């Protein structure tokens, strides 16, 4: 789906943890039963069918585990308003606080990329190409794979001439998690 305000739901959440600019191996990945049928347009993007998701946990069943994963973290998200909108809609259904009250902050790599590369394509695939991050194995949009790709892109983006100071870089990465949510 494309819009949580029209009832679209999260189908998959994936996140990887970075600590001192290194992947820790502490990943979060869950498929989620959206309690509704997959839409044709969304199905073409992620390939997750209604049948596949039917026996997966509902968001309410994984919410506390996910909240523990992101608690106090600096989230690194590509096109953050899109993903945060879906997360906040799910949290609101459960009477839980919005994302910004649960995390240290959010870095939007799309905003960063547009500042660093104005007028250029700045999709995750375009950034993978620009920074030499291999995404050849990516056929469909998948939350965990996209999180891993985004972590590599973020590290490449922030080590160049336009990077933050080293102190800021380490502070951001020390408790940061790159997240991608597939609505």
Model region roles, listed by residue range:
Residues 85, 122, 148:
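Active-site phosphate/pyrophosphate-handling residues
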Residues 156-183:
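Acidic two-metal-ion nuclease catalytic site recognized across multiple nuclease folds
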Residues 142-155:
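Acidic, divalent-metal-coordinating active-site segment for phosphoryl/phosphodiester hydrolysis
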Residues 111-114, 129, 152-155:
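Generic alpha-helical structural context detector
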Residues 140-141, 167:
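Short catalytic/ligand-gating loop segments at beta-alpha or beta-beta junctions
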Residues 1-103, 114-117, 126-140:
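Conserved non-catalytic scaffold segment of RNase H-like nuclease domains
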Residues 78, 107, 145:
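Active-site flanking residues adjacent to catalytic metal/cofactor-binding acidic residues
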């Amino acid at each position: 789906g494309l819009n949580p305000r029209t009832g679209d739901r999260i189908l998959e959440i994936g996140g990887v943890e970075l600590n001192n600019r290194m992947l820790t191996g502490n990943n979060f990945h869950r498929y989620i039963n959206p309690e509704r049928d997959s839409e044709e347009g969304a199905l073409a993007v992620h390939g997750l069918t209604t049948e596949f998701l039917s026996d997966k946990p509902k968001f309410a069943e994984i919410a506390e585990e996910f909240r523990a994963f992101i608690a106090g973290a600096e989230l690194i998200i590509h096109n953050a308003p899109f993903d945060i909108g879906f997360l906040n809609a799910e949290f609101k259904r459960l009477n839980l606080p919005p994302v910004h009250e649960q995390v240290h902050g959010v870095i939007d790599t799309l905003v960063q990329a547009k500042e660093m590369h104005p007028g250029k394509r700045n999709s995750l695939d375009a950034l993978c190409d620009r920074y030499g991050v291999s995404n050849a194995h990516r056929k469909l949009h998948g939350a965990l794979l996209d999180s891993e790709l985004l972590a590599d892109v973020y590290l490449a983006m922030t080590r160049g001439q336009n990077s933050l100071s080293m102190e800021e870089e380490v502070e951001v990465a020390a408790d940061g998690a790159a997240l991608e949510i597939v609505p």
